[in-house]
């Protein structure tokens, strides 16, 4: 079965899904909205469709979206430590602002932090601790959400 972007598909009497597909540049991903009689769930994970969240008109019980970085830029690039930290901070704030925007726009009953933090057991241990890089942990997220009244 092929499911098209932005089309609701009925899979069973009590199960509907809607995909929001992002196929732009290097981004090839999708978010899935699941609707049953018991609950609704939007799993966005790391799909960059924040500009399309308004397409979901249902009340959302559970919303899950990535809060921590997942790429090797800038932590593993050859540049000064100061520049890496600045770029990491900028990327982190942008990601967290998107999470806040998504939560405020969708107003879900529950938010489930997803896709983070990354753990790199064979690389520089500082990457796994989320200090000065994009791989932040839940305590950083919690504090940021509280600062934005979430």
Predicted feature descriptions by range:
Residues 2-72:
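Core dinuclear metal-dependent hydrolase active-site scaffold
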Residues 52-146:
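Cap/insert and terminal regions of metallo-dependent hydrolase folds
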């Amino acid at each position: 079965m092929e499911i098209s972007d932005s089309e609701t598909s009925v899979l069973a009497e009590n199960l509907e899904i809607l995909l929001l597909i992002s196929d732009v540049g290097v981004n090839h991903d999708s978010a899935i909205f699941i609707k049953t009689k018991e609950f609704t769930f939007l799993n966005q994970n790391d799909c960059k469709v924040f500009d399309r969240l308004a397409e979901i008109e249902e009340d959302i019980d559970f919303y899950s979206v990535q809060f921590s970085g997942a790429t090797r830029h800038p932590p593993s690039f050859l540049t000064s430590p100061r520049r890496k930290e600045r770029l990491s901070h900028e990327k982190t704030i942008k990601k967290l602002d998107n999470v806040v925007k998504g939560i405020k726009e969708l107003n879900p009953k529950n938010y489930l932090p997803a896709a983070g933090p990354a753990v790199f057991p064979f690389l520089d241990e500082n990457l796994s601790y989320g200090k000065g890089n994009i791989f932040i942990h839940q305590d950083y997220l919690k504090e940021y959400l509280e600062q934005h009244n979430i």
